From Swiss-Prot:
Homotetramer. This reaction introduces a second double bond into the aromatic ring system. Its EC number is 4.2.3.5. This is Chorismate synthase.
Length: 367
């Protein structure tokens, strides 16, 4: 199975299945000398872990990460960093009924067609459980970017179902179960989750990530544009069906005079581009959004077929998120961190001695 490694110079390879003994990964390309402990990674893992909120899956995993290599006496050595997270709360019996049946809207059918065999327990490799290692790896990148470059990465729930959420108070994001920066709307979110759960259904969502204080110059045209790699990174997250950068799809309805981000000596007049021009960071904040479909794991019966192609009705049992978008926030932050870290190293490798001769314009503050 290929496709398990992400990045060019700062690479992450993950392994493991939802109900296997453990998840793991190898982070290669991290510069030496970065102060790093398991506790530094655990902070981010705790934001993502299942069972932390009554509004998400009730599978309870501690997601305790172990650093197996690449760190000596509290600092990175420049060698591969091995990570391991044990699975401790598998309940595989919940999935016995789908061993011969395909859940509609899931990867069961496509994995069977591609590999001829599949681990049906909790979705196996296709489960969002795999993203725990991404969050741990992203925490390494975030730590480097923050300490060495002053780059800040923050994310929020931007929409749940028909409820669109503003960025009213970023400081509130980690103080509620929804990663919501619009705290006045939280009662609406709670009511929607209760309604969906009672109906045995699920609901979609959108998340937004901002990467602040990014230096200009990151991105490798033409095929490894910064925005292209951000889109790829977010599209690799389970359930993501669409990605926008800056104005995104709204640009189709704009005029050029409104969309262009005019330049002044005092800085950019706007950020419709989402911090990327020509595939290269402009020094503005990177702004990306991802839309996540409502999970197909639900108690409402759905039509499908079995492994013999015969019609069946499927009800997905087990412990599932009624809205997978909630826990996607720290995952999206991690993937953005991996992209920016990788592009920083690539930029430094080729252009470390470049002096543009042009002043760096101040970024426009959205707050």
């Amino acid at each position: 199975m290929s496709g398990n490694t992400f990045g060019t110079l700062f690479t992450v390879t993950t392994f493991g299945e939802s109900h296997g003994p453990a998840l793991g990964g190898v982070v290669d390309g991290c510069p030496p000398g970065l102060a790093l402990t398991e506790a530094d990674l655990q902070v981010e893992l705790d934001r993502r872990r299942p069972g932390r909120s009554k509004h998400t899956t009730q599978r309870r995993e501690s997601d305790q990460v172990q650093i197996l290599s690449g760190v000596f006496e509290g600092v990175t050595t420049g060698t591969p960093i091995g990570l391991l997270i044990e699975n401790t709360d598998q309940r595989s019996k919940d999935y016995s009924e789908i061993a011969q049946r395909f859940r509609p809207g899931h990867a069961d059918y496509t994995y069977q067609q591609k590999y001829g065999v599949r681990d049906y327990r909790g979705g196996g490799r296709s489960s969002a459980r795999e993203t725990a290692v991404r969050v741990a790896a992203g925490a390494i990148a975030r730590r480097y970017l923050a300490q060495r470059l002053g780059i800040e990465i923050r994310g929020r729930l931007a929409q749940m179902g028909g409820i669109e959420l503003g960025a009213e108070d970023w400081s509130a994001v980690d103080d509620n179960d929804f990663f919501c920066a619009d705290p006045a709307r939280i009662p609406e979110l709670e009511a929607l989750i209760q309604e969906v759960r009672k109906a045995g259904d699920s609901v979609g969502a959108a998340v937004e990530v901002e990467v602040r204080h990014v230096p200009p110059g990151l991105g490798e045209p033409v095929f490894d544009r910064l925005d292209a790699d951000l889109a790829k990174a977010l599209m690799s997250i389970n359930a993501v069906k669409g990605v926008e950068v800056g104005a995104g799809m709204a640009a189709a309805g704009q005029r050029g005079s409104a969309h262009r981000d005019e330049l002044t000596p005092a800085g950019f007049a706007g950020n419709q581009s989402g911090g990327v021009l020509g595939g290269i960071s402009s020094g503005q904040d990177l702004v990306v959004r991802a839309a996540l479909k409502p999970t197909s794991s639900m108690l409402i019966p759905g039509r499908s077929v079995d492994v013999h192609g015969e019609p069946v009705s499927v009800v997905t049992k087990g412990r599932h998120d009624p809205c997978v978008g909630i826990r996607a926030v720290p995952i999206a932050e991690a993937m953005a961190a991996l992209v920016v870290m990788d592009h920083w190293l690539r930029h430094r490798a080729q252009n470390a001695d470049v002096e543009s001769g042009t002043p760096v314009l101040p970024a426009r503050d959205r707050e």
